[in-house]
Amino acid sequence: MAKDVKFGIDARKQMMDGVNILANAVRVTLGPKGRNVVIDKSFGAPTITKDGVSVAKEIELENKFENMGAQLVREVASRTNDVAGDGTTTATVLAQSILQEGMKSVAAGMNPMDLKRGIDKAVRAAVEQIHLLSTPADDSKAIAQVGSISANSDTKIGELIAQAMEKVGKQGVITVEEGSSFEDTLEVVEGMQFDRGYISPYFANKQDSLTAEFENPYILLVDKKISNIREIVPLLEQVMQQSKPLLIIAEDVENEALATLVVNNMRGGLKTCAVKAPGFGDRRKAMLEDIATLTGGTVISEEIGLSLETATLEQLGTAKKVTVGKENTVIVDGAGHSADIENRVESIRRQVEESTSDYDKEKLQERMAKLAGGVAVIKVGAATETEMKEKKDRVDDALHATRAAVEEGVVPGGGVALVRAMNALSELRGDNDDQNAGINILRRAMEAPLRQIVTNSGEEASVVVNEVKSGSGNYGYNAASGEYGDMLEMGILDPAKVARSALENAASVAGLMLTTEVMITDLPQGDDGMAGMGAGGGMGGMGGMM
């Protein structure tokens, strides 16, 4: 296929046009008074969003050179979203500003490679300064404030996230689901819950709720099917002597074994309940090991030389309470040693860090949370489906932002942290004048998020930026109320991780784009395909079909 090639200024201009189209669509959403963007969908109602990365992902331009520029800046937003879960609009505004300033310098004859080296040097200094500015987000108040800011100043969402983190711990799993009412609600599942219920409804001992509830039961964990009752009779007799109920978690319980357990249960003999083990394949084995660690038991597995016929009470786990429903099982307060549980959680955390699959990461994090103390579910309420989608996106953003805040602490929000980090660049010098120009490019770009927040709130950006620069520390501008003051006291916080990743990703992609000299893309089909269509000679234009 024939290619279209553009060089030098022409290539950079078209790339910059694409960057501006995407960045101008995204930047209107920044800050407490940022506007919404309406996105048409090929099916269903249009989406209304104030989420930078959602807007960026929808933009595809007709001109292929412009589109390349737009896609490269979209990469900035996506990468920031992946790392920090928020700050996508800030990253886009930074990238656009670095490119605009940088393109002027390249046009003036400066060396693009030296400009990039200067920008990279400035980023390293600014990131160090951001770390120095950050304070730990230890208390619920700071977490709620970060969540509120990220959810577009929705304090209810911030409070719900703070409550959820308080209940399940900062490493616990918090999921966001669509609710069935107009209100946002929080549900917390204490203990370990997995999505398998009783094998037979005859195991239920609470007829009103159709659940099986046991206090201080023994828990038998088996990684194979149980179909022959004779395999487990010796163990059942030992459990009977202790007058305790028994929960069996196995790959399956069937035929004679299931029938005998059900009959025993109904006659009021041994109180039992059989549940299929959660997961499939290797994940099932791992989850059985998790339950064993939590309850202080051992998985009866032929792979390690254990059999049901010789199983003893010491190999069974125990828990304070177990509730088994039609579709779920909840184990509360397992008897496992806290040190063993911590080691298991740490082992899973290492697997999360090493995993490259998002799906595997999600499943590993769920396992980690179930061991660490439970799962919280935030149910988002709204009047219409369109509002529900928009709100769910905001809650997801807020959740990611609070996690980032817990990880690396918080800095003053509203673009102030980047303005303060500029102080680290005042004495910084490169190896030559072009590198110094690169440092100045980043210095000017670091004002851009604050300028955009002020512009979106309808004020004069230059006046506000000069006022903020004349102050120090947490002194900044609250765009929601139009007041100056201490940003931390006003509850305007950003996670340090968000500010850092936005700056690093914007400078990384923008620096590479500055050093572009040639752009190559496929020619549109019509440009090289039409010539062949006339070669038919009397075949009515069918020559191109041969």
UniProtKB/Swiss-Prot annotation:
GO terms for biological process: protein refolding. The keyword Transmembrane does not apply. Its EC number is 5.6.1.7. HAMAP family: CH60 (MF_00600). This is Chaperonin GroEL. Forms a cylinder of 14 subunits composed of two heptameric rings stacked back-to-back. Interacts with the co-chaperonin GroES. Belongs to the chaperonin (HSP60) family. The gene is groEL. ATP binds at residues 29-32, 50, 86-90, 414, 478-480, 494. It comes from the Bacteria. Its main location: cytoplasm.
